[in-house]
Amino acid sequence: YIWGAILPPDAANHRFTKTIHLYNFGYSLSILAFYIFPFLLTKKMKFKNFLDVFFKKNNLITFLFFGVYLISLIFFDNFENLTVLGKGIFHKLFLFVVTDSFYRLILTLITFFFSLIIILIYFEKKIDYLIISYFLLISLFIHPFMQEYFDPLILVLIFTFLKTKIKINYKNSFILTLF
């Protein structure tokens, strides 16, 4: 409780804005998916379970809202004027690898979509979705949005607080250590 808030003091005092930054929602999804992906590899899943994610009623509604979100990003926000600072590993990777901003936008939107899928596959309990929703909503008001805000917190939540449990055995510990 040294910070006195969920964000570092510098971010809480200077970076919490009254402007909504729509892209930060997707970037926070991609950062969460980056941390969740190794844990997803430890889950035993069948292909049928993977397909169920696309056909659950709640997830269909989520995909509908997410489609509206992606369309609003394309038409109502300016991708080219985003700052380089922050936004996580995928943003930095795409800046390094892709020079054309149109292709970078397409890759970013695809990353947002796959990040949503990873989160929907991994989490099983509604309370976990509520906790994750908090991070997604608060990211809309933080500028610039840094990956360091999630670094230790998401891992601590996964191991302790979240209801979706992981099974740690020799194979799973090797996978988690590798990442």
Question: What is each stretch, according to the model?
Answer:
Residues 7, 53, 68, 84, ...:
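Extended aliphatic helical segments
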